[in-house]
Each structure stands twice: as C-alpha cells, then as structure tokens.
Amino acid sequence: MEASALTSSAVTSVAKVVRVASGSAVVLPLARIATVVIGGVVAMAAVPMVLSAMGFTAAGIASSSIAAKMMSAAAIANGGGVASGSLVATLQSLGATGLSGLTKFILGSIGSAIAAVIARFY
C-alpha cells in the first residue's frame, strides 16, 4: 500500500470514528489533531521506505532496481558518469546517509499540512 493511500485511509478512518462516537464538539478538534499528527508521521516514515524500495540503500544502489536503471540512464545521458547534484546523486546520498533532522521536519510539516486539508473535508 502506498504512503498516500495509507495516509488517506488513516484520515478517513479517524474521521469516521469521530463522526460515529462524537456527541461533543471537543472530540472533533482532537480527531483533527490526531489526523494531522498521523499525516506527519506517515510522511516521515514513508520516504526512507520508498527510497529503499527503489533501490537506494545504505549499502549503495541495489542491482536490478529502479535506482540502478535511473543511474544507468543518467550515466549514459552524461557521457559515462552521474553528475554531482543530479536527482540520482541526491537520492543515492539520502539512501546511504538517511534523512537529516531538517528534512524530517520539512517532510513532517508537509505531511501534516496535507492531512489537515484532508481532515477539513471529512
């Protein structure tokens, strides 16, 4: 299951539970807060999993993976080497070293914002 589908599913589930169980006006804002937190956590957790699934691992680029195909295409396009700062080089660096604290903060913020927008309509 993709991260966006997982986030959407979690948001919908939280919203439905709140609608069924809520008799008070306080529960709905708490559910929205929970939805926003879930969105941020899912966004932070999904990126490393997606990078690994694509083949950008701590040990390097996995053979016969999407990452290997991307690297091959980038090398052919650049005459034999992958350009520093290119998408492939950046993703390889993220896969090898992991995400920085700032990157996690930004991803969490974006995931929370998306979840807040989704929760607003449910």
UniProtKB/Swiss-Prot annotation:
Residues 76-122 are annotated as: Mediates interaction with SKP2 and hepatitis C virus non-structural protein NS5A. The keyword Translocase does not apply. The gene is IFI27. Induction: Up-regulated by type-I and type-II interferons. Belongs to the IFI6/IFI27 family. The keyword RNA-binding does not apply. One of its GO terms (cellular component) is mitochondrial membrane. One of its GO terms (biological process) is apoptotic process. Residues 103-112 are annotated as: Required for hepatitis C virus non-structural protein NS5A degradation. It holds the Pfam family Ifi-6-16. Probable adapter protein involved in different biological processes. Part of the signaling pathways that lead to apoptosis. Involved in type-I interferon-induced apoptosis characterized by a rapid and robust release of cytochrome C from the mitochondria and activation of BAX and caspases 2, 3, 6, 8 and 9. Also functions in TNFSF10-induced apoptosis. Changing F56D: Increased pro-apoptotic activity. InterPro entries: IFI6/IFI27-like, IFI6/IFI27-like_sf. Homodimer. Interacts with hepatitis C virus/HCV non-structural protein NS5A; promotes the ubiquitin-mediated proteasomal degradation of NS5A. Interacts with SKP2; promotes the ubiquitin-mediated proteasomal degradation of NS5A. Interacts with NR4A1. May interact with BCL2. This is Interferon alpha-inducible protein 27, mitochondrial. Residues 1-33 form a transit peptide.
